[in-house]
């Protein structure tokens, strides 16, 4: 391999032997003064340096990166395991006997309030952990931060598994384990996005969601395997396996390279160079490593010159920080408002209502569909782009909810709810619930994490991802807590509520979510600095790759009515 790539000739600066970088990056990025100079005004032809080609080392590079990112993404498995197991716990006899209340006939049950609290309080812990504990990633590094939050998660599991008959002890354990998972949901996608190459970033961040679905599926299977026991094996064995997952996660962190962006920010340049070299499987002195390192250094220096980011700058900073922060909050909120947890948290109970003799088996079917559908997203997210997947995923879920809710309302109980349900209607609802899961798992499930991991500059990234994730968890709490009450009052009309949310989601994505497929994290920031319209963002080209006929101004204005491009593929 030649030491200098064919694509460029390195230009020396007057002060050092470094490569000339794209010095026209937004000078106003997150500046406290709020000055947002035109991106084009800061560029001259001599300042634009073509991007250096990555080392041509074959598929081995992708294997190395993929293994590292899968280890980090295993944090999603921990989250998914909780989702898959708690849905079965609330229907298991020993769990009901220990933590529930007694009917007059001697049978045990969980009240709607207690069920909602036990299931949903986990989300409140996650919201707090995402905001408070994610800061560990900035203080000590993403890897160390992940190890610490996994330890906190384990403490919560110990409290839960030690519970004998006090539901509030189990409740407290759920809060503490939620703190750990909240930190994981911020730090895992963050580390993956900062390690992965731009051309594979969407796919590799989506591995986090694949791990969530694998955890949900195996959690369902474990519940199915323990449900016939009559003692605490029903729920303590699934909880006990959490220790194995925590140890695997901690062990994996020993082999994962630290985020080069964090290392540069911490002044550990040699370690950052080694991290980039390990991920790209090439020598530390390779020109591509030098180019990537100096690009990151330039970005970090601009952020450092602007000073420490305050929480207020998430909404007042430049470029377009208010728009970006609100987009992160909305995307994460809308991911919950798809209604996925309606099925995953309460799937066992919901399908008891449609007359199934073994609703645990139905949950396993859901888990299989969810897992393999999410695997499909590894192809779709970087093939079709973020915007297309989000919009057409919303359309697919709307169609599924129309059928699911309509059949549930009009055909499930033809002779009244006090009479046997229609088996045909119940089967139809299960089929369209599976179609819904396919639409969700291939689009909104992974891409919500991809979007928030890509769209924030490093200086405020942990804060932005924390507040966006907190919005997700808060909505998760509200949906999880109130679902038993809402379904008790309106039953399957609930599906129409989620359908309306997905109609709104389609239009929100069209107007406010830009396309970031194939862009580096620094290039995403440049795109925001230029003020590109989201529905034209798929045509945006980074400065270093533009031809002479490229018209950047055309992407900032739209002279035709928006409805003409509303259903376009861009």
Curated annotation (Swiss-Prot):
Give the family this protein belongs to, as stated in its UniProt record: Belongs to the major facilitator superfamily. Sugar transporter (TC 2.A.1.1) family.
Phosphoserine sites (modified residues): 23, 38, 44
One GO-annotated biological process of the protein: carbohydrate transport
- UniProt organism field: Saccharomyces cerevisiae (strain ATCC 204508 / S288c) (Baker's yeast)
Give the record's glycosylation annotations as residue positions.
228
**Could you tell me which residue ranges are on the Cytoplasmic side of the membrane?**
1-60, 138-143, 196-201, 258-340, 382-388, 453-469, 513-570
Name the chain's protein: Low-affinity glucose transporter HXT1
Q: Where does this protein reside within or beyond the cell?
A: Membrane
């Amino acid at each position: 391999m030649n030491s200098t790539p064919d694509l460029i000739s390195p230009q020396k600066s007057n002060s050092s032997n470094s490569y000339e970088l794209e010095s026209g990056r937004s000078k106003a990025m997150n500046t406290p003064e709020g000055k947002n100079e035109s991106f084009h005004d800061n560029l001259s032809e001599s300042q634009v340096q073509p991007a250096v080609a990555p080392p041509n080392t074959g598929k081995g590079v992708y294997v190395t990166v993929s293994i590292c990112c899968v280890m980090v993404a295993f944090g999603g498995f921990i989250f998914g395991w909780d989702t898959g197991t708690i849905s079965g716990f609330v229907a298991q006899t020993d769990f009901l006997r220990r933590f529930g209340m007694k009917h007059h006939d001697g049978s045990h049950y969980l009240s709607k309030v207690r069920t909602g609290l036990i299931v949903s309080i986990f989300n409140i812990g996650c919201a707090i952990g995402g905001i408070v504990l994610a800061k560990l990633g900035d203080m000590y590094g993403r890897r160390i931060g992940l190890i610490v939050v996994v330890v906190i998660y384990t403490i919560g599991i110990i409290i839960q598994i030690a519970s004998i008959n006090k539901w509030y002890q189990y409740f407290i354990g759920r809060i503490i384990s939620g703190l750990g998972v909240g930190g994981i949901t911020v730090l895992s996608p963050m580390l993956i996005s900062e390690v992965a190459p731009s051309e594979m970033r969407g796919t590799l961040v989506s591995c986090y969601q694949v791990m969530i679905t694998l955890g949900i599926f195996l959690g369902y299977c474990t519940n199915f395997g323990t449900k016939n026991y009559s003692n605490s094996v029903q729920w303590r064995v699934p909880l006990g396996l959490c220790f194995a997952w925590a140890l695997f996660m901690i062990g994996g962190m020993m082999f994962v390279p630290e985020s080069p962006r964090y290392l540069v920010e911490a002044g550990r340049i040699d370690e950052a160079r080694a991290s980039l070299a390990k991920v790209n499987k090439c020598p530390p002195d390779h020109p591509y490593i030098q180019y990537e390192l100096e690009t990151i250094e330039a970005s970090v220096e601009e952020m450092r010159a602007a000073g420490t980011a305050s929480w207020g700058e998430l909404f007042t900073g430049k470029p377009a920080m208010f728009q970006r922060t609100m987009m992160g909050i909305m995307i994460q909120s809308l991911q919950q408002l798809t209604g996925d947890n309606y099925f995953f948290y309460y799937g066992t109970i919901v399908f008891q209502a449609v007359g199934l003799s073994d609703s645990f088996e139905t949950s396993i079917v859901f888990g299989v569909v969810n897992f393999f559908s999410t695997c499909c997203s590894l192809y779709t997210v970087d093939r079709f782009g973020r915007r297309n997947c989000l919009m057409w995923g919303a359309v697919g879920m709307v169609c599924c909810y129309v059928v699911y809710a309509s059949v549930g309302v009009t055909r499930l109980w033809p002779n009244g709810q006090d009479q046997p349900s229609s088996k045909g209607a119940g089967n139809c609802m299960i089929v369209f619930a599976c179609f819904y899961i396919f639409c969700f798992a291939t689009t909104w499930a992974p891409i919500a994490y991809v979007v928030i991991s890509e769209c924030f500059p490093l200086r405020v990234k942990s804060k932005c991802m924390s507040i966006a994730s907190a919005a997700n968890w808060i909505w998760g709490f509200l949906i999880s807590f109130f679902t038993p009450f809402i379904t008790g009052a309106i039953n399957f009309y609930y599906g129409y509520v989620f359908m309306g949310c997905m109609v709104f989601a389609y239009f929100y994505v069209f107007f406010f979510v830009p396309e970031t497929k194939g862009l580096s994290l620094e290039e995403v920031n440049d795109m925001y600095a230029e003020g590109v319209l989201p529905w034209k963002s798929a045509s945006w080209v980074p400065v270093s790759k533009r031809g002479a006929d490229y018209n950047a101004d055309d992407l900032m204005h739209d002279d035709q009515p928006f409805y003409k491009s509303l259903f376009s593929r861009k």
